[in-house]
Amino acid sequence: MPQVKVVLVEPRVDGNVGAVARSMANFGFTELCMVRPCELTDEAFKRAKHAGYILREAQVVQSFEEAVADCFHVVGTSGIVTAGEKHYIRIPLTPREFADRLEGVEEKVAVVFGPEDT
C-alpha cells in the first residue's frame, strides 16, 4: 500500500476539516496537508474526536504545487459531472476501483479534495 497524503484545498468549514481528520484516522491515514485553510477552532477538534493529532501535525502551505511536490501520483476528487469539451481526462472510479489501481504502488499518492464549493 502506498503512503497516502490527503490534501484539502482552501477548506472553509473547520468542522469539515475535523471530520476529514477523523475519517483519515479511522482508515489508518495520518498525513494531512491544507492549502490556504480557514482557521481551525475548537469545532474542528470536536469533530476530529480521537484524531486531533492529525490536525495538530497537518502541513499548511500556500499553493497546490507545494502541497503535492513530494507526491508521485496526484488524484483529484469531484462530485461534479462535466459535459462538453475539456482539456483533461476525467476517469470516474469507485473507491474499490481506486484501491485496486493502487495495488503495487509504492510511491506517495496525494488524494485531493476541494475547494468545498466546487
Please give the residue ranges for each predicted region.
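Post-transcriptional modification and biogenesis factors for structured RNAs
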Residues: M1-T118
